[in-house]
């Protein structure tokens, strides 16, 4: 699924295009995301004891390709977890990562995982929420935060209002597919600043499906 036409997993051949350098840098030179494998998560209840991939950082223009490679290296199987800590980033790449997570039957949570597998609270905002939505189920770690805001076009557009509406429609379609209530798009539309969702609000939206009592 591409939220903005012409953007997705791709290998640029024409390096004269400005965005090509950003892609190659994110893919091969200095990826904007980092990852580490956790062999056994220390989390409460059904979320605990799983193998996990901890992913943190900003979602860059080549993040989906990078993520697929890290998944293959981690040897995660259905029911394993992606633990997220990210301020957001590229909307299209986030949606593709969410689709990859869903296609592999992985679950998601927000937090920071150390080498022992213990998870501490963290945050997942903006485009990261689309990645989080790809999980099934989606665990809510006590103290972690999910933040949303209105997405707008980042490149010059002839009709920015129409483009913003189109992006909102695409996000709505994606979230609906992932089983999240349409009310999340209403929350996004309220502000361009990050709006942090309360635990009960995220649960009511079905963004969080399984609260975790102890991080």
What are these regions (language model features)?
Residues 78-93, 107-114:
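Short, glycine-/small-residue-enriched flexible loop/hinge segments at domain edges that mediate gating
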Residues 17-28:
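Alpha-helical transmembrane signal-anchor/signal-peptide segments
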Residues 59-80:
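A short, well-ordered alpha-helical element
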Residues 102, 106-152:
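Glycine-rich beta-to-alpha active-site loop
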Residues 55, 82, 132, 202:
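Terminal peptide-recognition signature
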Residues 26, 30, 36-66:
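STAS-typified acidic loop motif
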Residues 1-14:
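Hydrophobic membrane-insertion alpha-helices, especially the h-region
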Residues 149-215:
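Charged, glycine-interspersed solvent-exposed loop segments at helix/strand-loop junctions
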